[in-house]
């Protein structure tokens, strides 16, 4: 699989996870925290992976992290700025022209699909390359040019909170299902994990996928067929 040395990877650690009741990034997924699983998925294909979240929280996992200084604490007077602030922080910190930005709660992402998305983005004239599903756009599994940072920071300063509203000012190249599903047809690919039921479903899927992979590895190969010896010996 190709490594895109001109692309930086960022994982948005997420907010308070009020519906989950726990930090989604630290939930066990296949024996490791979900955010570490996601980092390992990105590491082989990008120049480096950075978490946008609390540096002290993720340092113990060996992950580089930057604080999202633009995020305000939740409250009636200062509502949280959500993932838009995380995207702004990533694009402010980056030195790479292209940046793969994903949320930490997308357990079904595949390396094959991310590799394809990056290849697709590097040939695009858009400022952001964003997949779309039947539910709408998926800006938290997308590729952004560094120059998008200024427009997104400006949107934050004006009080914009929805990512979908902020990117209206960008030149967006939408990737429709008919295109990306040729690479990864799974309906689960871009499904995020918000509630305990979603987490249980993702864990079951992960366990089944690992079991299937192990069975494939352990499956014995058929013994090679022996050549039949001729019943008639050559006469001297």
Give the label of every model feature segment.
Residues 1-2, 212-236:
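Short, basic, low-complexity termini and linkers enriched in Ser/Thr/Gly/Pro
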Residues 2-189, 200-211:
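Nucleotide and nucleotide-moiety/phosphate-recognizing core
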Residues 197:
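Conserved active-site and cofactor/substrate-binding residues in soluble primary-metabolism enzymes
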């Amino acid at each position: 699989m190709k490594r895109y040395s001109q692309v930086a990877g960022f994982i948005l650690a997420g907010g308070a996870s009020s519906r989950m009741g726990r930090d989604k990034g630290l939930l066990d997924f296949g024996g490791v925290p979900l955010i570490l699983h996601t980092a390992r998925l990105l590491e082989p294909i990008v120049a480096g992976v950075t978490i946008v979240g609390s540096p002290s929280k993720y340092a113990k996992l060996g992950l580089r992290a930057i604080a999202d200084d633009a995020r305000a604490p939740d409250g009636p007077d200062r509502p949280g700025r959500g993932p838009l602030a995380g995207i702004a922080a990533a694009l402010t910190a980056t030195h790479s022209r292209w940046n793969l930005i994903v949320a930490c709660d997308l357990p079904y992402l595949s390396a094959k699909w991310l590799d394809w998305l990056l290849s697709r983005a590097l040939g695009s004239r858009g400022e952001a390359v964003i997949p779309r599903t039947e539910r709408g756009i998926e800006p938290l599994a997308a590729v952004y040019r560094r120059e998008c940072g200024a427009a997104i920071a400006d949107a934050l300063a004006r009080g914009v909170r929805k990512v979908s509203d902020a990117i209206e000012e960008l030149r967006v190249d939408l990737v429709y299902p008919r295109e990306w599903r040729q690479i990864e047809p799974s309906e689960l690919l871009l499904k995020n994990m918000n509630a305990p039921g979603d987490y249980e479903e993702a864990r079951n899927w992960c366990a089944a996928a690992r079991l299937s992979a192990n069975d494939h590895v352990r499956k014995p190969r058929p013994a090679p067929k022996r050549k039949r010896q001729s019943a008639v010996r050559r006469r001297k």
